[in-house]
């Protein structure tokens, strides 16, 4: 699909740039430094949209001392700057905001530092976030971090308190992240029954049941939905509703970006502007006169998906 293809391109850009920095810097330094990256979020799940940032973590081997970590920080900072200016039309935006301690945390950590943080201080949302971690390239250190997350996330089912914390966090996201002045139903990602509802439901089911079933340990939303169906966690009708809404929502997001341009604001919102709505509808295969049919289909699909979400998300035990 498009999301996976975009990830292939992104992987090639990021890994090539990182390798170039390695070659350039190691020509100046006596001691080689090898930085590896792990993808998170939609990047980790291979579900990128056209305007997605690339959420990543940077990791180095435990043998790195303070001087090596300083060099690694400088190199990653330059890598971010290089990629962000690589294209005016669609820059490659590396985002490290999901790293331990957020913006106040180190850009680069050793493997041991990551594992110690997650074992001792991580919050439940960080465990949920790590479900979509993917090692970039073939490096041993990034793969070791991935292997750790598989054990960490699926060591045991969520406790009742952890489940409740995720549920409350979803309430806060719904209340705080949808911009004012927008009909929530028109927000493809964050609106009721939208892509976020599907993702949160899938991840909660994975965290609850993945410790007993390794087939549920996938970063792909599509694959996770299918595995949840096969294991009786979703009925056939629930699966079909979630899968079809997910696919339709992703198609709408891509059409919205193409119709409005990558720099346009509100790219996850079905537009009220007739000209933009017509352009979006025609990209989706509708005629000019069928633009309202596209909107109606989304409203119907997301409403039914919200019913599935309400039934399952608040009653997981």
Tell me what each language-model feature is.
Residues 1-317:
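A nucleotide- and high-energy phosphate-metabolite-utilizing enzyme signature
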């Amino acid at each position: 699909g498009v999301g996976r293809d975009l990830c292939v391109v992104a992987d090639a850009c990021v890994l090539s740039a990182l390798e170039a920095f390695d070659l350039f810097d190691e020509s100046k330094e006596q001691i080689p430094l090898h930085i590896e990256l792990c993808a998170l979020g939609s990047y980790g799940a291979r579900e990128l949209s056209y305007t997605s940032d690339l959420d990543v973590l940077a990791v180095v081997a435990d043998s790195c001392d303070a001087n090596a970590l300083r060099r690694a920080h400088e190199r990653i900072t330059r890598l971010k700057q290089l990629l962000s200016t690589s294209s005016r039309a669609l820059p490659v935006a590396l985002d490290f905001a999901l790293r331990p301690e957020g913006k106040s945390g180190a850009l680069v950590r050793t493997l041991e530092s990551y594992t110690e943080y997650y074992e001792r201080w991580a919050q439940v949302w960080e465990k949920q976030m790590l479900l979509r971690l993917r090692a970039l390239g073939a490096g041993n250190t990034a793969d070791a971090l991935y292997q750790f997350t598989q054990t960490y996330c699926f060591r045991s089912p969520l406790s009742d308190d952890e489940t409740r914390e995720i549920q409350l966090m979803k309430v806060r996201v719904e209340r705080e992240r949808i911009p004012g002045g927008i009909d929530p139903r028109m927000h493809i990602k964050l609106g009721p029954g939208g892509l976020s509802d599907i993702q949160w439901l899938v991840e909660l089911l994975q965290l609850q049941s993945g410790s007993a079933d390794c087939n549920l340990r996938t970063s792909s939303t599509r694959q996770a939905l299918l595995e949840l169906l096969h294991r009786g966690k979703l009925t056939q009708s629930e699966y079909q509703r979630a899968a079809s809404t997910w696919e339709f929502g992703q198609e709408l997001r891509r059409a919205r970006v193409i119709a409005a341009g990558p720099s346009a604001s509100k790219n996850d919102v079905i537009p009220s502007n007739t000209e933009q709505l017509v352009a979006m509808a025609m990209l989706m295969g509708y005629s000019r006169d069928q633009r309202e049919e596209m909107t109606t289909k989304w409203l119907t699909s997301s409403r039914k998906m919200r019913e599935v979400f309400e039934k399952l998300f608040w009653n997981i035990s």
